[in-house]
Amino acid sequence: MVAPLSAQVYKEVDKSPKERLQDFLDETATGINKAGKTIGDFLGINAEGTGDEVKIDGVKYMRIHTSNLFYADSTDMLTLCRKDFAQRYPQAEIVSVVIPQRSWNQTALKEGSKITAYKRMALCYVLAKDGKDGYINARYSFRQLRNPGKRWTTPEGYWPRFDRADAIPNVHYEQLKLK
């Protein structure tokens, strides 16, 4: 005698195929968003920026930083930022190169409830005079990763990584200095 085979049964038989497809697409979009956030967190990227932006006349600028507070590894880091900036903007006159934080921003990366790695980041800002027209404010990031029990490693292209530069007209520069 042959045993009957069970066919695939939809759990939600009261929904039409169109509704089931929409549910599937919604779940897929949620999964993709979570994966994107996880990858962004791992790389130190987020949609909101770093929270150091100021809006003037509808334009978002990074804040101007002129005080170096980071002394751990800063000499070499500042030199690397200065060198890269000078290559990118040879006509600009560098005013300051600073890391405006006291230590590395360090976070633990988790998979569920298990810590899988650590990451740390420091931001470097280069401010330069752009002729008589205004200023250039550039941000670089230094990032490192470490698995538990291992040494810090630097992902390729992140020592330093050029993140962004703002061209700032003189009139906006004066307003940014006050913020």
Residue ranges and their predicted role:
Residues 9-179:
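Cystatin/cathelin-like cysteine-protease inhibitor module
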